[in-house]
Amino acid sequence: MTADTGDTWHPGELTVQARTGVTEKMAGLGPRLIRDSMPDPHRDFFTRLPMIIVGGEDGAGYLWAAPLFGEPGFIRAPSSYLLTITLTAPCPHPLFSQLRVNSRVGLLGIEFESRRRNRVNGYIVQRTRDQIDIAVQQSFGNCTRYIQRRQRRHNPQHENVSTEIFTNWNRSLRNVITNADTCFIASACPGEHSENNRGVDVSHRGGDPGFIRFDKQQRLLIPDYAGNNFFNTIGNLVVDSRVGLLFLGFTEGHIISLTATAEVLWKIDEPVLCGEHDRVIRLTLEAGHIIRNALPCLWQSMHDAP
């Protein structure tokens, strides 16, 4: 980011930071922690990954979070301001056929073995059948908290990919989601390309199985744990209710990707629903995809995340 603290946070993030009493603190930290270019350790980090999570908007204006896969090296950072993804493997999620030059995207690199994660937000400057080039507008890291350590292995069923669309929850889907310990959420703050603090973001959410639950109206409830006080996701939801949610079936190779509308519930207003948490995100399903055998690799849990 630029050195101007006014350019670091958008109005939604500033609203949430004010409500939680961290405005002054984050005004000083923001320009130091959120950069407009990738430091060399982040550039090296992305080149080691076999997967990256992408948040983006489809042609109808819905947000999605979806994974891209390849052998380590399929992601490169030719400079501090450019991230290049070579599409060496099929991209079964429909989002990727709809991303174009100037599409805003959020990227999350996560290394389950080390529990490291780094993020890049920006926009596509070149798109071919085999490659996506992204101009970096925001680059920052996150702590390892709530990331489950996992070890990668080959998925022998990966060739048998099939897709099913759903618009309602069934028992099987509810069971998968309520037993998940990890999900990824895409959110957005609309704006022009010149505004570095606007665009799409994708973040990791983790917890013990059962940390995501359903209410009586079959809406998803995701707690917002105390963190770095950036409030990227919560701040986005203050100004734009669209979200994309992704669940990876680490042991069987399937993915569940859905688009939804969301609202932020605050404990002071909804003490029963929020329980011990200061905030909860409540999501109403629009539509989703089950993509079976989409993961070319499986991940075996190594131990519980702190």
Regions found by a protein language model. Give the residues of each.
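Binding-site signature for planar aromatic cofactors or substrates
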Residues: M1-P306
